[in-house]
Amino acid sequence: MVQALVFAVGIVGNILSFLVILAPVPTFYRVYKKKSTESFQSVPYAVALLSAMLWLYYALLTSDLLLLSINSIGCLVESLYLTVYLLYAPRQAMAFTLKLVCAMNLALFAAVVAALQLLVKATDRRVTLAGGIGASFALAVFVAPLTIIRQVIRTKSVEFMPFWLSFFLTLSAVVWFFYGLLMKDFFVATPNVLGLLFGLAQMVLYVVYKDPKKNSAVSEAAAAQQVEVKDQQQLQMQLQASPAVAPLDVDADADADLEAAAPATPQRPADDDAIDHRSVVVDIPPPPQPPPALPAVEVA
């Protein structure tokens, strides 16, 4: 009866863990469509890959079929995620991810396995150490999203914190916690307590910041106020610097009157369009008069 219950809980845990593994699929589909990783980070996926690799090694030592199956799938899928990330990441992010994968997923994992296989002869001791290391990195998997949590709090947006990943991560932590208790495997049960706490924290943040309109309205109002103040300051500076609206004085008025009374010079002819032809009176001179007649002269 107990074995059947343990197996049933393990199956449920595998299903939920599989959903957790598939939760970032929309995220990486978005990366593929936009050909850009935007603000997404590779650290959680590299840590998740290392955790799956360590648990796979632990499952091989303990002959736990349920842990073996789900962590094999986890290694494959997390590797695909990192491959997609490397294809579309900027140069700096790609270089950082490559260094991280080489140092952590290759060098560190190889060092752990080699040390346990070569230096620890007792099988029970090897299982205990492998379980402790696996539990430590399982905690790192749950702590890795803290960078995303900080980003959510700073930007007041859950755009880069996938909801379904947080949701299924929380459920998976609950199920694997009970699986560890039933199996009396505290290396499995202990890290999932922290996983439950961080999962609940992410769910709370999602509820608080899920309304982008409300958050953007506050941000837009503050931004609009800053723009308004800045515009007023710029307007005041323009008014002070512009000679067209400089304060008037007596000398300026006199100069303006003299300039208005001065006739147009040949160098500046008046614009014909500005003349009202209806108000112009043309002075036409009269026709020339004939010269007066000479008086008649009588001839004697």
UniProtKB/Swiss-Prot annotation:
Basic and acidic residues compositional bias, start-end: 269-280
Topology of this chain in the membrane: Multi-pass membrane protein
Positions of region (Disordered): 256-300
InterPro entries: SWEET (IPR047664), SWEET_rpt (IPR004316)
Gene3D superfamilies: 1.20.1280.290
Ranges of Pro residues composition bias in the record: 284-294
Domain of life: Eukaryota
GO MF terms, alphabetically ordered: sugar transmembrane transporter activity
Protein family (similarity comment): Belongs to the SWEET sugar transporter family.
Name of the protein in question: Bidirectional sugar transporter SWEET12
Gene field: SWEET12
